[in-house]
Amino acid sequence: MNFKAIVTLFFLTILTSVSFSREVISFNQNWAFKKGPFTTDLLQYGNVFSGTWQSIAVPHTWNSKDMQVRNDRFTSNEKFYVGDAYYRKTFIPESSWNGKRIFVKFEGVNTNTEVYINNSPLPAKKEKGNVVYDASAINGNYQIVGRHQGGYSAFVLELTNMLKFGVENEILVKVNNEATPQVIPVNHTLFPMYGGIYRPVELIVTDKINIAVSDYASSGVYISQKDINKKSASINLKVKLENKNHDARDLQVVSTIFEQNGAVKAKNIKKYRLLPQGRQEVMQDFNLTNPHLWQGLEDPYLYKVVTQLVDGNTVLDEVIQPLGLRKFELRTGEGFFLNDIKYPMYGVTRHQDRWGKGSALSNADHNEDLAIIKEIGATTIRLAHYQQSAYFYEKCDSIGFIVWAEIPFVNRVTTLEEANAKQQLTELIRQNYNHPSIYTWGLHNEVYTPNAYTIELTTKLNDLAKTEDQYRYTVQVSGYNVINHAVNNNADIQGINHYFGWYNGVIRDVDKWADQISKDFKDYKIIFSEYGAEANPSHQQEVVGDVGNQWANPAFFPEEFSTKFHEIHWGTIKRHPIFLASYLWNTFDFATPITALNVEPRNYKGLITFDRKLKKDPFYWYKANWSKEPVLYLTQRRVIERVNEITPVTVYSNLGTPTLLVNGVEEKNFVIGETDVHYIFQNVKLKEGDNIIQVKASSKGQQFEDKITWHYLKDNPKAISKDGPKSNKNEHIGL
């Protein structure tokens, strides 16, 4: 059989299965929305559901704009709405679905959700972007389908026995984004809890005999890898099955591993008698020879695993999952090894919101973030501090990023959140089990007192993670800035968040700290899990000190301090192999419920602005250090107005030694800074008025150039003060 025939047969198989077994139907359009506060519960009987509702599509958050409103004092953002809101949608279940199973899958609803079905919805009509419901009718026929607590993981509810087929039904979703002591995160000050159905929704229609849909909203197929090398790979599939018929059925579970060109790599057929009670598991083993390994960004090769549930010649159900064959290993004091090859862990973190949209992001938004992260040269992403979009994990698989995935057990505890933390960890692992990009499960981040409770719960979460997935690492993160704290070291890896010069000490303290832990904890697996400093591009300062201005009133976050901070921190990290990986905080500015005077309500520690339009100077510092793409960049390009006649000029160049021209005259006096891409030209003299700063370099016959203009006056009324603060006694409190 030729290549074209193989590919055609493969895709015909897929199309046949989709047409006659499982159907997955987008459920994103034609929703109506109403936000509180409400004086009475809308679910009470009566005509309170009548009137005008906003016509919307999901993904949707009601906080897409009010999170951006600036307050006039350092406080919580009082304009940010938290409370109840409702979504409703009418739809007609097809008559052909009668006798099948019907599920609704929500990928993300923040935070507490109740779902109802109504078989006799109110009459309605659309008017100018709204949906108007008939006020003359009584509408109280709502039956509860189910509830979900937690705003970041997917959940599935079965509608099968609650629908009327061939006529209009209505689904109603009640959402509340208030903090509750039983649901993590219990503290909503670190990042905003955007309320709404902010990720896609879909209907799933299956046969009565099916691969499990509602196993914590997972695929129902779990692919485990062991003994992975260039010569062979051992694969185990666990397939969870359900039979809602009244009799047992003799079936075949057929799992096929396909190459990217459609050729069959391996196939396993297992006969199984499926009983009509409970959820049952079928195990299938594969031993592959000469596997094509998943090698991160260098070669993110993905097989496709197609699992079919077959009755005679009929495919009852089918699930398709990715397979990237790889082995992760963290070697203490050496680094991260991917398939026994040392692999650089250039790490960034990412929150899932952006200007004007909040958390209701499109695939195009995710793609833009991924493209920026790839541009900077990052190899690994910490998706903080919660489960993120399924699409984002899928793209990390196909691009080749190494991923740290975690639950939102952050900052504070109530001692009432244990059950929900376990639920969200189980959801995270089962829903993302098959992503080859994920190397570790995050258990907590900066969780403070009480110590005994935090230790106990973290230990339980670690045990749970190891029960769910014995093939990946677990990690916990400390905000106490020390390794040997009682709360630490209850997972495979200890992450440390430390912000030298921002929340405590001076920037250079990072050197002494790294030296000390390298000596005292040489046998520990340690990751520098967060470090960063705020940088507002509208705040510029010619010379900065050794500490930041995080508590300045009004707020003043000069970009230059962040640049200095990152130069020193990355230089230290690079020199200390005790750090098996590191993650700068953050790739992008993100919103925060805590606001400061004279700035928007957000955290400015990102290397890129909240709208993704401006890349700050530190972005190019990392790009020059990490990326294989050519970088030639002059820093302080936004400090145009200057008062220092004699000044350094900093250039980032991964092209070798650059040539610096100031007003056409070459400057030759330079030193190498924190790394070999860091060129600091010293004692450069400016003239009164405009100064043209130009840098040139060449590589492989190609010429590169960067140019900026500075305006110098001895008594420049537009310039910021010459110097910054030298000391700081404030401590990190988890903001």
Model-derived regions, located:
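Beta-strand-rich binding/interaction modules
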Residues: 117, 230-273, 282, 647-669, ...
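Extended substrate-binding grooves/exosites of carbohydrate-active enzymes
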Residues: 45, 55-71, 141, 146-148, ...
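Short, solvent-exposed loop/linker segments at the N-terminal edge
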Residues: 225-233, 639-645
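Signal that preferentially marks extracellular ectodomain short beta-strand elements
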Residues: 157-163, 284-300, 681-684
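Accessory beta-strand-rich segments of carbohydrate-active enzymes
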Residues: 25, 29, 34-38, 65, ...
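Boundary at the C-terminal end of the N-terminal hydrophobic targeting segment
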Residues: 19-21
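Bacterial N-terminal signal peptides
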Residues: 8-16
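Internal, hydrophobic beta-strand segments that form the core of beta-sheet-rich folds
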Residues: 299-310
